[in-house]
């Protein structure tokens, strides 16, 4: 299913109906497309340190580049230092937003080259205002310290689709 940005308007009214000031916790924050539409105390965690680096970088004033060419993309893929820039390139300049899943390229409906990097930059900067106040934490869901009486929204990796870097046990998750 991927990003929840399009369906958040349908899910959130149901989920927030009885929230009553409780902390909103997302152990699998991913693209932050639910947490950015929630007010109040929020914790967004992810085991992928690059996800957390990108969002904390944005919170601290990191401005992504408007353009990254294919050679710069390849260099970033080899670098792998955990910085907001490498994180942005790894997600924002990759095919379908998949972590270094291939340099994103293509054309618009009018045949003009698309600038996926600029599109990603605009999207995350638009989202940035709604991420203020979110506490982003690099943690597995198992080790995340969740405040008592929190409302927890889990959107774990999907079973049988994309292979994740460190693997993910759905059996362990359902026992959690």
Model-predicted regions and their roles:
Residues 2-3, 42:
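A short N-terminal beta->alpha junction/helix N-cap motif
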Residues 3-20:
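Conserved alpha-helix/loop element of class I SAM-dependent methyltransferases that forms part
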Residues 11-12, 24-38, 44-49, 92-95, ...:
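Conserved proline-anchored active-site loop of SAM-dependent methyltransferases
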Residues 13-17, 126, 176:
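A generic secondary-structure signal
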Residues 17, 33, 57-61:
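Short helix-loop boundary/capping segments at the starts of domains
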Residues 17-23, 147-148:
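Short helix-loop-beta connector
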Residues 40-136, 142-143:
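Class I S-adenosyl-L-methionine-dependent methyltransferase module
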Residues 165-176:
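Glycine-rich S-adenosyl-L-methionine
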């Amino acid at each position: 299913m991927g990003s929840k940005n399009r369906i958040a308007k349908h899910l959130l009214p149901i989920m927030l109906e009885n929230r009553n000031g409780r902390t909103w916790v997302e152990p699998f924050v991913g693209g932050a497309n639910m947490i950015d539409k929630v007010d109040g105390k929020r914790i967004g965690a992810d085991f992928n340190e690059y996800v957390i680096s990108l969002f904390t970088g944005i919170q601290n004033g990191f401005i992504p580049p408007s353009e990254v060419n294919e050679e710069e993309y390849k260099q970033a893929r080899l670098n792998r230092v955990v910085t907001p820039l490498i994180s942005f390139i790894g997600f924002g300049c990759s095919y379908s937003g998949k972590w270094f899943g291939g340099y994103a390229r293509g054309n618009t409906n009018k045949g003009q080259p698309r600038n996926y990097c600029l599109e990603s930059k605009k999207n995350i900067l638009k989202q940035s205002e709604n991420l203020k106040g979110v506490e982003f934490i690099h943690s597995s869901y198992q080790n995340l310290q969740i405040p008592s009486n929190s409302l927890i929204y889990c959107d774990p990796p999907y079973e049988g689709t994309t292979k994740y870097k460190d693997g993910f046990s759905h059996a362990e998750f359902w026992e959690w």
